[in-house]
Amino acid sequence: MKRISKYALAITLAMPLCAAAGNPQKEYDRALKHEISGQDSAKVMTLAENTLSVNGPDIPLEDLTAGKIFYMRAASGVLPSFEKYIRKYAGITPVSKAELGRINHKDVLIIGVRDAKDASASLRGISLPECKIIMAVFGAKERKARKTFGHVTENIVSSENTAFFSQIAAAEAIFGGLSDENSPAIRLGYGYPEQAGMSSDSLSKIDAILRETVESGAAPGVHVLVARHGRVVYDRWYGTTMGSMDGSARVDGDMIYDMASVTKVMATLPFVMKLYEEGKIKLDDRLGDVMPKFKGTNKEDMLLSDILTHRAGLKAWIPYYLQTIDSTTRPLPQYYRTVPDSIFTQKVVDGMYAIGSIVDTIDRQMIESPVTDDKKYVYSDFAFFIFRQMAEQFYGQPLDSLVQSELYRPIGAWRSGYNPLERFPQSEIVPSENEKYWRHTVVRGYVHDMAAAFLNGVSGHAGLFSTADDMAKMSQMYLNGGSYGGRRYLRPETIDLFSSCYYCDQGNYRGLGFDRPSFSNKIMGPKTFGHTGFTGTAVWIDPQADMVYIFLSNRTFDSMNNNILSRGNFRSRIQAACYSAITDGAKE
């Protein structure tokens, strides 16, 4: 079945193109011959999308979990932008012609073609796997692409150009990052601010704030991503992993950060909302009725809504690690070993294993901790100790495997999860601290939070590691009302409820699990929700402005006592620049 779509976002209706009066392909060819910047780049990107030809029943790819996604260059030609951007959508495994036997029928093979003639000769006589095959053909008209490669697959994306604009557009088309006249985009797209009702000149002011953030010593490295109207329009990073320390390297766009308390809303809270949707819990349930372990304790009558909004009277936290070190901050031998055994099972960092019974100690001290009954707001990590246990109780899986199978893998957040060293090299993870008060080492790839570290890095309040791209996908899922990539995760009304100011009338500005703008905030829209993290992270989602703002840094390196980030208001200043860049009036 033939499918040819002329892609365009609705926003382009407000951005007249010369191509409207003539041939879009000729206009695109003409534009590529000139130096392009700012608003012109947005127009050319739109032309690239408009002139892309798409054929085949398997485009866009929806299910990212059925099997692996492989990528092969059909010949020697490299397609750097295409290869970069398909990796933004999913984990991609490179494969050569000699390795095609690795692919099974559940997998997907994407073949990149820069030169149709060379590629045709290169593929001749090769036995291709019996799986979904998608070809991205550049430098060839649609008719030639179909004639040359139609015997290989029905699924062909083609462009007459090899320019990076076309390569990005092809990646978007394959994974559903573009809309057409028949269907909306199902995943984030990539482009320029003017394609999303924003000003490139205004948004570029963030660059100077990024430099100032690093050069002031607020954090060694920082990454900011802004998405609006379903399109990533700003995605830049600055700085290094460890400042001037030996072994430091420049940060890049794929770096993985310790998300700290952003874990609460990007790992644990989705399952609390799901339990609510499924009728397994109600907001006015008492904790002891939902979790029998709290029966007979001073927490049994706490309402779930009060726990979610941090007004249940829970203690803020307990510095458990202080109970396991001596007066010189050295680990006490009864609590630690340098190698694991059946007793010392909790790895807190390389060469340091805590006694396994500490897990029960942490739980017992949390259960027995004092409470207050005045309904005052006290931000508490214990709330999400509880909700992690609740999710695991109902779903019968550890939280770290639950988020992978039910959230991150299907959504395409392939670089997210707990304990990243199990999947990625240490060099791809920014360090969180040169820690000198407990573990006495550079903490890199192990959770910074001390309580989560005792729990093998997995907790409801901390432990998630992620990238700006992956946090944008999760945020867009929330902004879409609970759907992403053609799959529904939550209902819109559930997200509306949990992100609302539930106890506004009683002076509490928090959402149900989500953070929200304080009553004095003059930057964010009133319906904005998200969370910040101790390590220097922030995720904010504004439904009214249709905007996602991601800020990632390792401000705790080399010391968690570094407060320059908050004193300099860098996160807020960048967010204010995002709102100032909006040109289509939808700021509130």
Each predicted region: which residue ranges?
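Short, surface-exposed loop or secondary-structure junction motifs
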Residues: 299-527
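Preference for extracellular/luminal or secreted protein segments
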Residues: 21-195
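Short, surface-exposed beta-strand/loop micro-motifs that present aromatic residues
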Residues: 535-548
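Coil residues (strongly favoring Ser/Thr
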Residues: 41, 96-97, 202, 208, ...
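Short, conserved catalytic-motif segment at the N-terminal edge
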Residues: 198-259, 280-282, 449, 560
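Bacterial Sec-dependent N-terminal signal peptides
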Residues: 1-25
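Short active-site loop at a secondary-structure junction
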Residues: 216-225, 245-309, 369-383, 459-462
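Short, gly/Ser/Thr-rich active-site loops of penicillin-recognizing serine hydrolases
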Residues: 23-26, 59-61, 146-147, 180-186, ...
